């Protein structure tokens, strides 16, 4: 262990297997807080590689509480957060559109860290219970096609790093790997990331973690979502290869809006925005969800282009199917809680 830590202190890269060894020590509570802090900061200064990101993500998944679901059928669309945009809950809203398309969505998320309302906060405001058992999450995925997976419940071993992360007060590798560690075995994924320089690398990591197809995007304004404010950069992983692209809202028939047009509020305000979008209320909120749902449908392979994804998302919202998914989730959740 000391030899591996020294490699990082000396600015040497670790293999996936070496990183897995260190991460396992962390997640099993055997690495002291002092050594953990030194390791995380040395890794940050050196710069995290794809192998290192994959190694720590695999170790985190190995100790996670597993949620049973047929491998390769579900997807996730959560992002890293940390873009400081104070936007509404875009990926949570988009998740209901993806589910309405017949894609099982295992929505991995947490409470607010840097924004006023995280996905868990808005879900609770909507009446969605975030404290369900793994078998209940499986039931909802099967019956409704969408379930919320509260990160602290499915990753209890993260308790060993919470104090150190808080004390450091700066982003570390843990800010990047949250969306990589869904306890449901995914085959496709849409992942927003706040660092544009890591698009290609993160797409490679998703491939190493078993994704067949994935899109990693960084929106205009360096958002961890697709944005209407300008050029969106994204990496497509497919067939073992990564290709980089850009897309503007006008390319898919959507109107440009400044970032301020999609500012969110607290959980109550964001829940109201989510409902208004699923009702089809025109404006920047709706168009932002159309763009992000379009990317999600494209990442899943449900459509061949983002344009087709945007068009399908419009139909799923205007038909009421996306809104019905939210209603169904709450209805079937009552069955679970009554057991």
From Swiss-Prot:
It is an enzyme of class 2 (transferase). This is Anthranilate phosphoribosyltransferase. Homodimer. It catalyses: N-(5-phospho-beta-D-ribosyl)anthranilate + diphosphate = 5-phospho-alpha-D-ribose 1-diphosphate + anthranilate. 5-phospho-alpha-D-ribose 1-diphosphate binds at residues 79, 82-83, 87, 89-92, 107-115, 119. The keyword Glycosyltransferase applies. It comes from Listeria monocytogenes serovar 1/2a (strain ATCC BAA-679 / EGD-e). It holds the Pfam family Glycos_trans_3N.
């Amino acid at each position: 262990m000391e030899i591996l830590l020294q490699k990082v202190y000396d600015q040497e890269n670790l293999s996936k297997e070496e990183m897995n060894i260190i991460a396992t020590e962390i997640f099993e509570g055997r690495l002291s807080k002092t050594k953990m802090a030194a390791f995380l900061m040395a890794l940050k200064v050196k710069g995290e590689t794809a192998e290192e990101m994959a190694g720590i993500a695999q170790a985190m998944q190995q100790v996670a509480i597993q949620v049973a679901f047929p491998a390769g059928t579900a997807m996730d669309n959560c992002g890293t957060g940390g873009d400081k945009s104070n936007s509404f809950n875009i990926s949570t809203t988009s998740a209901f559109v993806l589910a309405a398309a017949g894609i099982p969505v295992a929505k991995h998320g947490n409470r607010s860290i840097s924004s006023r309302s995280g996905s868990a906060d808005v879900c609770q405001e909507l009446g969605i219970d975030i404290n369900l058992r793994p078998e209940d999450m499986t039931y909802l995925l099967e019956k409704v096609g969408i379930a919320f997976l509260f990160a602290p419940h499915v990753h209890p071993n993260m308790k060993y790093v919470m104090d150190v992360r808080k004390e450091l007060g700066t982003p570390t590798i843990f800010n990047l790997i949250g969306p990589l560690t869904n306890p449901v075995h995914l085959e496709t994924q849409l992942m927003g990331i706040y660092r544009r320089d890591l698009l290609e690398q993160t797409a490679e990591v998703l491939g190493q973690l078993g994704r067949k197809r994935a899109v990693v995007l960084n929106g205009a304004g360096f958002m961890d979502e697709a944005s209407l404010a300008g050029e969106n950069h994204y990496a497509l992983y497919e067939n073992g290869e990564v290709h980089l692209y850009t897309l503007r809202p006008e390319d898919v028939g959507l109107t440009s809006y400044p970032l301020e047009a999609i500012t969110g509020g607290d959980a109550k305000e964001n829940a109201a925005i989510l409902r208004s979008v699923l009702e089809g209320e025109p404006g920047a909120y709706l168009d932002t969800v159309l763009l992000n749902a379009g990317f999600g449908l494209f990442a899943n392979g449900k459509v061949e282009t983002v344009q087709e994804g945007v068009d399908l998302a419009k139909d799923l919202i205007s038909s009421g199917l996306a809104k019905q998914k939210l209603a169904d989730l709450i209805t079937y959740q009552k069955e679970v809680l009554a057991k």
